[in-house]
Amino acid sequence: MDRSKVPAVLSIAGSDSSGGAGIQADIKTITAHRLYAETAITAITAQNTLGVTAVQNISPDIVAAQIDAVFDDIRPSAVKIGMVSSAEIIEVIADRLSAWDAQNIVVDPVMVATSGARFIAEDAAEALTRRLFPLATVITPNIPEAMALLDYEVDSERTQQNAAMLLTRRFGCASLVKGGHFVNEANDVLAEPAPLDDEGNHLGDPLTTWFRHKRIETGNTHGTGCTLSSAIACALAQGMDLADAVNAGKAYLTGALAAGFDMGKGSGPVNHMWQY
């Protein structure tokens, strides 16, 4: 590979002191894909495999300055957005990404941690859907997040697919609803907006694609959502279309889960470097 042409991927997310999720998981994932990782940190969290004990948001001005510094020099080919718990920070992220005409934006709507801790207030959730979702190439909610976004019960593959289609219709972006919270399955469904006619109207319902992978029986699941969304961003940065990018991201996460680390007293981390 020509080292002057290595794609960069920007992660806009919170820092995880235990290294298993957030910015740290994103950097590991991007590096494992042999791409160049850049960051804009939105919050500092004190957390480990047992849960989150403290969150300190970064000043919105500093978040904006980080994004500007990245785009002004080493422009990313894709952007992954993770934990953003402040409406004001969401507003500046949307403003800066719009100003720089950012492409290939993957939004992981981090609303609730695996441990159950809630990361986002109601006003921030509203800003997330109003400002960031319209900029996204794809959003990647898990089932609890999809239910919270839609106020809709998801308890089967049929309702999971309906949720993905509803999200795509409502927010205008592709939606990947992850099925890992089902007991016996790890199947995800992608809904993409239908093509547009000459007047800008969608020609039919969203197009859906299922991604079926075997469920890895492990308790080491810390950072799985961060890892998958970053892996999808990496694939988009390398020029894959969205469905292929999701499939590649799923395959990477499956390997990382299978090789996960038995570390800590709770939900341990996945092994981001499992291919090496």
Protein language model regions, located:
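Short, well-structured alpha-helical segments that form the helix of a local strand-helix-strand
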Residues: 160-168, 209, 241-256
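Charged C-terminal helix
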Residues: 6, 54-57, 243-276
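Short pre-catalytic strand/loop immediately N-terminal to key active-site residues, enriched for Gly-Thr
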Residues: 12-18, 208-223
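N-terminal phosphate-binding or glycine-rich loops at protein starts, especially the Walker A/P-loop
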Residues: 7-31
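Conserved phosphate/ATP/ADP-binding segment of small-molecule kinases
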Residues: 122-208
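Phosphate-handling active-site elements
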Residues: 34-38, 198-209, 235-249
